[in-house]
Amino acid sequence: MAKVGFMSLGCPKNLVDSEVMLGHLKLKGYTITHRMEEAEILVVNTCGFIESAKAESIEAILEAASMKQKGACRKLVVAGCMVERYREQLLADMPEIDACLGTRDIEHIAEVIGADDRLFEPERDPAYLYDEHSPRLLTSPGASAYLKISEGCDHACAFCAIPSIRGPQRSRTPESIEAEARQLVAQGILEVNLVGQDTTDYGRDFGDPDALEKLVRRLGTVEGLRWFRIHYSYPNRLTDGLLRAMAETGNCVKYLDLPLQHADARVLKTMARGGGRSTFMKLLGKVRRTVPGVFVRSNFIVGFPSETEASFADLRDFVEEARFEHVGVFTYSPEEGTPAFGLGDPVPERTKQKRKRILMELQQKISRAKNRALEGQVLEVLVEGRHEETELIFKGRHQGQAPEVDGGVLIVGGEPEENTLQPVRITKGHAYDLVGEVVEGGTEAAVRAFEARRRTGGAGHA
């Protein structure tokens, strides 16, 4: 069978889609190659969320098209979010594309590759969800993987095109999620990252607003699942029961990904999100009281059409007061088909970049102070391997650092075993990364600490 090369862009949810498509292709007998120049078929799984992501996707398609002209490639398939938004335009403007595949068609990847008609569209099941029976080929290195618990979104945030791309909320059953978690553990995975457009909305489509709380407790019973974390939560969906479940479930890491997008009430109202600075501070207080030792990450958008100097100042003051462990900042880009598109783009790009820089510099100071406060503490660290720049240093992450976005722990001295959890004493805290050394006793000490935490629901750092 033909060799297939994959380029996967965008968020972890898109990565899961790519892994499912790879699983289907492998099941059909295709050979998967990491050497793109050898691939006879190239698949580009695109992201179309914001302007910069679209530009990156177009660049990847053009790169693949160049390989098609010069290399072994004879067929170029474009998949993902950009196809859902711009299928006809892509096919019209880029004759190099041989076929397109939308986000709700991923189980038909082999069928699309085998079709002769570039306009071929498989019969669509709008309720399609991958599950524990779907073939999936993991591409994440090491002992960490993503697990998508739902697809689609029922929110109507003014800036966001995701509901039109991914469709309405569709939750997997808890039995299916638990089964896949057990499959991942059997493949050597220690850390599972739960993802969805809004994980805290999980289960509401089948009538259970407490479904995520129950799922957390359910995953707490999975033997060998050392860590799992919740990404993409929504502020008004954080129930007391969910927070208690996080605090009381030993292998649920004390980490919360809570994208708030802004803090000024007027801007949030224009975003169709609601809330505001005082509401969010009360929420953060409750989170930190209920889940002691929790690490909180948030994301914010600067330069939204209704953002004035005063409303940005409100956001800046909130970030300073809230003292998050991690913050991401994005500049607003108007997206066709969203309610905010009609508001135009009145904030100059230069102003957006300045505001982003101000927030990031502020957060750097906060993160540095928080990381320095960890000096001398022993943290459980997932050792991911040797550092790319030197074999003398190993890299890893502690519970408060999600994959790819939150920095890491640089482990100096010794030879810690890769893809294991090790107790590491922090010797130095920087703005993004920590430096530490493995505590004598290594793996045995880590196992004892893990068992104690499972019994008590402890926070995982001393």
Protein language model regions, located:
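Proteins enriched for Cys/Gly/acidic motifs involved in redox and nucleic-acid/cofactor modification
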Residues: M1-Y202, G241, C252, L256, ...
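Conserved strand-turn element in the central/C-terminal portion of the radical SAM core barrel
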Residues: L9, A156, C160-G167, W227-N236, ...
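Conserved glycine-rich "GG(E/T)P / GGGxP" loop and the immediately following alpha-helix
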Residues: G48-A53, I189-K214, R218-V222, Y234-G241, ...
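Short acidic/polar active-site loop segments enriched in Thr and Asp
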Residues: D98, L190, R226, E325, ...
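Conserved, mostly hydrophobic/aromatic
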Residues: C157, I177, L194, I230, ...
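Radical SAM/AdoMet-radical enzyme domain recognition
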Residues: A186, E213-K214, R218-V222, W227-F228, ...
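Short, electropositive alpha-helical surface patch
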Residues: G207-G220, D240-K254, E307-F324, E349-K354, ...
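Terminal RNA-binding accessory module
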Residues: G342-A462
